[in-house]
């Protein structure tokens, strides 16, 4: 196999209206069959609905929801002594944590029954900003799994500190 090295990171441009990369990442995650205009329409309708009903800046609500859902640690399966163990580790980058959080929010919306995507995404973002909802529960579940598998990690003190620490992961990248 050829050894080409790690693939280059693609630079994402911010979205045209709110000028935020995280909003553009959400649009790309909602995208279906290459119809980006429909994805933009869904996201902007949700943001309009947030500003009307919650009387808050929709980008701030979105960032708050994203920070509440971002995992601090992840669990990787490793093969040790003939068995597969779940080994927790601190999240390697803020980019990865943000991408996982967006993926969880969108998948939680898609799993909800009935209604249109606008109302499902609105309810999930508002619940995540209030530390509720399916995506937030998924993060809590992952952290519990990491705590229960602490004995498999090399540095359990770092993992405990990352989970219990209330400060957010540094977003120096975006």
Swiss-Prot record:
Listed A to Z, the keywords are: Chloroplast, Plastid, Ribonucleoprotein, Ribosomal protein, RNA-binding, rRNA-binding
Q: From what superkingdom does this record's organism come?
A: Eukaryota
Among SUPFAM superfamilies, the record links this protein to: Ribosomal protein S7
Recorded GO CC terms? chloroplast; small ribosomal subunit
Q: Name one GO biological process term.
A: translation
The molecular function GO annotations come to:
rRNA binding; structural constituent of ribosome
Its predominant location is: plastid
Matches recorded under Pfam families: Ribosomal_S7
Per UniProt, subcellular location reads as:
Plastid, Chloroplast
UniProt-listed InterPro entries: Ribosomal_uS7, Ribosomal_uS7_bac/org-type, Ribosomal_uS7_dom, Ribosomal_uS7_dom_sf
Q: What does this protein do?
A: One of the primary rRNA binding proteins, it binds directly to 16S rRNA where it nucleates assembly of the head domain of the 30S subunit.
Q: Subunit details for this protein? A: Part of the 30S ribosomal subunit.
What's this protein's family per the entry?
Answer: Belongs to the universal ribosomal protein uS7 family.
Concerning PANTHER family, the annotation shows:
RIBOSOMAL PROTEIN S7 (PTHR11205)
Q: Which NCBIfam families match?
A: rpsG_bact
Name of the protein this chain belongs to? Small ribosomal subunit protein uS7c
**What is the organism of origin for this protein?**
Stigeoclonium helveticum
Query: Quick one: which gene encodes this?
Result: rps7
């Amino acid at each position: 196999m050829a050894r080409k090295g790690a693939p280059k990171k693609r630079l994402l441009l911010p979205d045209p209206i709110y000028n935020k990369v995280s909003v553009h990442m959400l649009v790309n995650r909602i995208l279906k069959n290459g119809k980006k205009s429909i994805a933009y329409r869904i996201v902007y309708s949700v943001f309009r609905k947030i500003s009307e009903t919650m009387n808050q800046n929709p980008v701030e609500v979105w960032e708050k929801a994203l920070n509440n859902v971002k995992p601090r640690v992840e669990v990787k399966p490793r093969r040790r002594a003939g068995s597969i163990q779940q080994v927790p580790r601190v999240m390697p980058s803020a980019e990865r944590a943000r991408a996982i959080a967006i993926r969880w929010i969108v998948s939680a919306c898609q799993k909800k029954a009935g209604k249109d995507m606008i109302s499902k995404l609105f309810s999930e973002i508002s619940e995540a900003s209030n530390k509720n909802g399916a995506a937030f529960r998924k993060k809590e579940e992952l952290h519990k799994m990491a705590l229960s598998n602490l004995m498999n990690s090399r540095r359990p003190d770092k993992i405990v500190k990352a989970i219990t620490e209330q400060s957010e992961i540094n977003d120096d990248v975006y």
